[in-house]
Amino acid sequence: MEVKRLKVTELRSELQRRGLDSRGLKMDLAQRLQEALDAEMLEDEAGVGGAGPGGACKAEPRPVAASGGGPGGDEEEEDDDEEEDEEALLEDEDEEPPPAQALGQAAQPPPEPPETSAMEAESEASDTPAEATAGSGGVNGGEEHDNGKGEEDGPEERSGDETPGSEAPGDKAVEEQGDDQDSEKSKPAGSDGERRGVKRQRDEKDEHGRAYYEFREEAYHSRSKSPPPPEEEAKDEEEDQTLVNLDTYTSDLHFQISKDRYGGQPLFSEKFPTLWSGARSTYGVTKGKVCFEAKVTQNLPMKEGCTEVSLLRVGWSVDFSCSQLGEDEFSYGFDGRGLKAENGQFEEFGQTFGENDVIGCFANFETEEVELSFSKNGEDLGVAFRISKESLADRALLPHVLCKNCVVELNFGQKEEPFFPPPEEFVFIHAVPVEERVRTAVPPKTIEECEVILMVGLPGSGKTQWALKYAKDNPERRYNVLGAETVLTQMRMKGLEEPEMDPKSRDLLVQQASQCLSKLVQIASRSKRNFILDQCNVYNSGQRRKLLLFKTFSRKVVVVVPNEEDWKRRLELRKEVEGDDVPESIMLEMKANFSLPEKCDYMDEVTYGELEKEEAQPIVTKYKEEARKLLPPSEKRTNRRNNRNKRNRQNRSRGQGYVGGQRRGYDNRAYGQQYWGQSGNRGGYRNFYDRYRGDYERFYSRDYEYNRYRDYYRQYNRDWQNYYYHHQQDRDRYYRNYYGYQGYR
């Protein structure tokens, strides 16, 4: 572990893990951690395992090399400070306790529906950093930084879902109180405490709505300086196109298909336990007696306190139906709760099933009506659906699975022995001759053949309607519409009686949908598909960040700007349907930052869905001017760098020194009398350590340790004497280099 390369939050995390004090300047934290590491190393060499906090304190102090010793040291220090600034803003996220821990602190609520309880447990955690940035008035879509592989990571952002090193609530409160006190004392020195981000208060309204959380995600990622580096695309191996397996082209993006493509599991089950995901097979059938098997091999572990259950829904569906099995026309599923589902209608059927159970799915096309039946562990459960052949027409039925928090394994007939023998005359779909099967669409051979369409427009402008209509009118392109409403559909629990969600749970579900959507966009950029990104995307920085992810795609932008009357009417309709309104502050922020995109290196084409550019530009300009008048002045972020270094650089350019704006030198008697004490003394430069000691004691109220800091600072008294004797005639140069001079050796 290289201590000097660690950032402030990482230093604090390592110290807390060892039970050591995590308050103070970065220099103190680094030395404290280095001493602990030295003590652990010495004890390991001596054969004593596990150095505790006491052993670390007994270790010999090891000085940490000061950064910025050379001519380029200041620049390197500034870069580190910039990174620490971002860390300070994200520090709330790093210290946020996991939902399970937060649930343990709260009182146990009365029994509620599973979905509501799980989401309320999640909401006990602290606010995300996106919430802190969304409320600020200065979000204007600047350049981006790596939102992480990491969006989500975070925003970024690291893309990892969890942050290590969570701490106990009591210790955290004590640490925060101590940090606040240290920051008050260390403000003049530009310490880390001064850079600590301050979270904004939550809005009084508990329920915010979809547009609010979409704006939060955009505002959070707008701090990014560059898009995250795209991961290398996995090379597709040559596959036998006659095999029946799960189709990676039509499956959900968040469904992780196994390597052999005969099974899979949800990708975000731990972060988003309410999210359903699934896939269809590559082949369907239109005649005969055909079957396949599905087994729940494992229920995925979930966070402590999460009340979500593991479920599998298995059955048949036609091509082009939605991925939610049983919730669309010509989509038929058998649910693990002992329910059958067709076109969104649920009825009781058969038995419940779960881990290690095998469900047999049978389609009989040889009767007057197509009969779909199921079995559990070899036991026949009877016919669940009867479908008119006239209504089904020539559509093929494809095996389809949909799961939540579980791992599923499928047998299409590729196994030597089935889990349970099928009824007589039924054959596995893999045994059906290839010419009698119906193949689904083949994915593009290369990612360069794929296309992404970025929707741009204010909330309620009609982007979603345009995207859905365009995808329906171009079925051969098989567009995947990525929007918050699509994700919400996959997160909702449906059944005999849909549980009524309270505003708090509904608000949390919308928040999770926006976060999940950000991760799906990153996954989409590595998939050989066509996409429509159905979000507001009013920030130029957000447009750039997303489109740069799809660098090998054909990238198009569709701007939807209706006239004012139509937009107001659509907003009212949206409010009636979705039950939420866009907060005024969020709408003003979007208007103020909305500008029409122009064709550039990451936008191959810009088109307009309603009003053309000549008509849309005056409306957008009007929105922008009105919003800027109503918005409060933007709060500029305070410069949390080392203020002393910055002030010195500014003063050196004016021929001034460390204190004040007075021009100084050996001829300035007033300056020498004022600063150095006794009148009549010729102006000189007192020992650097004496001056630093006074500042240190005044700000931190503790004794200055000379030996501790002697390796960090040079003896400027000796250096300045050398400088004076060698350059007495060059007064101007002398003034310019009061602090910048490196001395002669």
From Swiss-Prot:
The organism of origin for this protein: Mus musculus
PROSITE patterns from the UniProt entry: B302_SPRY, SAP
Protein name in UniProt: Heterogeneous nuclear ribonucleoprotein U-like protein 2
Boundaries of every B30.2/SPRY domain copy: 224-417
Family annotation (SUPFAM superfamilies): Concanavalin A-like lectins/glucanases, P-loop containing nucleoside triphosphate hydrolases, SAP domain
Alphabetized UniProt keyword annotations: Methylation, Nucleus, Phosphoprotein
Positions of the SAP domain: 3-37
Entry-annotated residues carrying Phosphoserine: S159, S166, S183, S186, S224, S226
Modified residues (Phosphothreonine): T163
Assembly mode: Binds to MLF1 and retains it in the nucleus.
UniProt biased composition (Acidic residues): 73-97, 230-239
Comp. bias (Basic residues): 638-652
Stretch list, region Disordered: 44-239, 625-664
Modified residues (Omega-N-methylarginine): R654, R682, R736, R745
Biased composition (Basic and acidic residues): 142-161, 183-221, 625-637
InterPro entries reported for this sequence: B30.2/SPRY (IPR001870), B30.2/SPRY_sf (IPR043136), ConA-like_dom_sf (IPR013320), P-loop_NTPase (IPR027417), SAP_dom (IPR003034), SAP_dom_sf (IPR036361), SPRY_dom (IPR003877), SPRY_hnRNP_U (IPR035778)
Secretion signal span: none
Gene3D superfamilies reported for this sequence: 2.60.120.920, P-loop containing nucleotide triphosphate hydrolases (3.40.50.300), SAP domain (1.10.720.30)
Family matches, as Pfam families: AAA_33 (PF13671), SAP (PF02037), SPRY (PF00622)
Superkingdom of origin organism: Eukaryota
One Gene Ontology cellular component: nucleoplasm
Subcellular location: Nucleus
